[in-house]
Amino acid sequence: MSTLDIHQIAVLSDNYIYLVRCRATGACAVIDPSLAEPVLAAAESLGWTITHILNTHHHYDHTGGNEEIKAATGCEIIGFAGDAHRLPGIDRTVVEGDRVAIGQAEARVIETPGHTLGHIAYWFAESSALFCGDTLFSAGCGRLFEGSAGQMWDSLRKLRALPAQTLVFCGHEYTQPNITFALTIDPRNEALRARALEVDALRAAGRPTVPAFLGDEARSNPFLRADSADFQEAFGMTGADPVEVFARTRLKKDHF
């Protein structure tokens, strides 16, 4: 049973900010605030009191609201120890396996280098909620700005190993273009084709495609399928090292 209330805020062209609130205590965290004003307005409208900010990585579209929200609320800012020098206003640092308590709701920290070297995710197991920033997207993954293909593949495998019913809350609304790309390299994937229809219907109705179930991602996201025999066959890389398959997939997406 979920211990969290989750409120999703769409900002900029395609970013998502998340407010997560412990139902038992009212403690509330903001995850990846690119902007302050929409967060403060949403919290006031909901009657939620912000106590924490959780950053997944240092990019400004995930941290731009840190200091203004902290000044307005006195909240504690939490992020990866190795990126402390790049996270505005940080108060507390965490590493792999650390636990972060938002009231009685607890998240496990998972290090996910690749998009950036200091990227982390927060997994609230009791609520089946994964906040993964720009590592894993719905039907895609983040670009490799700092890390290697091997690092990113290892990070994605760590996330893929979580329970299939986990809800994936990522940092951007990229699902539709991600699926358009995926269909060019994995066109016979029935799970992917079914998702394409669902996603088109959601976007036509003006609705978000995030969150997505991790089990659906495992079946349809090409970046989670680099070690899948049928994906390797479809991609013309049967028997190849999954890191090489992932790297080739990422390169094709970068130039799509």
From Swiss-Prot:
Pathway per the UniProt entry: Secondary metabolite metabolism; methylglyoxal degradation; (R)-lactate from methylglyoxal: step 2/2
Gene Ontology MF, one: hydroxyacylglutathione hydrolase activity
The keyword Transmembrane is assigned to this record: no
Named cofactor requirement(s): Zn(2+)
EC number: 3.1.2.6
GO biological process, one term: methylglyoxal catabolic process to D-lactate via S-lactoyl-glutathione
Binding of Zn(2+) 1, residues: H57, H59, H115, D134
Complex formation: Monomer.
Function: Thiolesterase that catalyzes the hydrolysis of S-D-lactoyl-glutathione to form glutathione and D-lactic acid.
PANTHER family, per the entry: HYDROXYACYLGLUTATHIONE HYDROLASE, HYDROXYACYLGLUTATHIONE HYDROLASE GLOB
Family classification: Belongs to the metallo-beta-lactamase superfamily. Glyoxalase II family.
Protein name: Hydroxyacylglutathione hydrolase
Organism per entry: Rhodospirillum rubrum (strain ATCC 11170 / ATH 1.1.1 / DSM 467 / LMG 4362 / NCIMB 8255 / S1)
